[in-house]
């Protein structure tokens, strides 16, 4: 039984990735803040694909260590880590509340890096696994009114490229 962990799984790319992985018969750990939506997705996936689905209603930016502990305590081996949770803010950079940017960086960068660090070490020990960090075309260029988001996605791209090079030959695939 192979497990995939998907953050930001309650909608959008994360939700679609969960369905694609379930179709491939991966058991799932779905993580997002919106528990009701996660439970609905879980029920639908279990009904359609018959796989095991765990739901964690956690703010990834605050609880990425709790996600790891949940898996360790249940002896769940994560074969695929999909770091999809993230958000952006639209507005003039200097007029935004700095707390918004702090939260964005905590989620888009700090939590992503933390999850890679925790699960990546286990994958290296097993000489297998796949880390997918969801980036954006915004990471390739700067832009007005979302400058911190653009910068956070540039971080994701560059961090992922560096991690891929470090883990080359370790049996762990890393992509963005």
Task: Give residue spans per PLM region.
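Conserved NAD(P)H cofactor-binding loop of Rossmann-fold oxidoreductase domains
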Residues: 84-89
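Residue(s) in the substrate-gating loop at a strand-loop-helix junction
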Residues: 136
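Substrate-binding pocket helix/loop in short-chain dehydrogenase/reductase
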Residues: 92-105
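Conserved glycine-rich cofactor-binding loop
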Residues: 10-12
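Active-site loop immediately N-terminal to the catalytic Tyr-X3-Lys motif
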Residues: 143-147
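Active-site helix of classical SDR
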Residues: 116, 152
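Conserved glycine-rich Rossmann-like NAD(P)H-binding loop of the short-chain dehydrogenase/reductase
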Residues: 24-40
């Amino acid at each position: 039984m192979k497990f995939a962990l998907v953050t930001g799984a309650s909608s959008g790319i994360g939700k679609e990735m969960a369905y694609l992985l379930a179709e491939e018969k991966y058991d799932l750990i779905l993580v997002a803040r919106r528990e009701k939506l996660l439970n609905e997705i879980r029920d639908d996936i279990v009904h359609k694909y018959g796989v095991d689905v765990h739901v964690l209603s956690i703010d990834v930016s605050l609880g990425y260590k709790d996600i790891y502990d949940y898996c360790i305590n249940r002896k769940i081996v994560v074969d695929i880590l999909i770091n999809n949770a993230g958000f952006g803010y639209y507005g003039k950079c200097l007029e935004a509340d700095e707390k918004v940017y702090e939260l964005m960086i905590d989620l888009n960068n700090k939590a992503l890096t933390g999850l890679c660090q925790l699960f990546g070490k286990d994958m290296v020990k097993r000489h297998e696994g796949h880390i997918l960090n969801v980036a954006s075309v915004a990471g390739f260029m700067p832009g007005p009114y979302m400058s911190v988001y653009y910068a956070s996605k540039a971080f994701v791209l560059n961090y992922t490229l560096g991690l891929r090079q470090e883990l080359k030959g370790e049996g762990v695939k890393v992509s963005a």
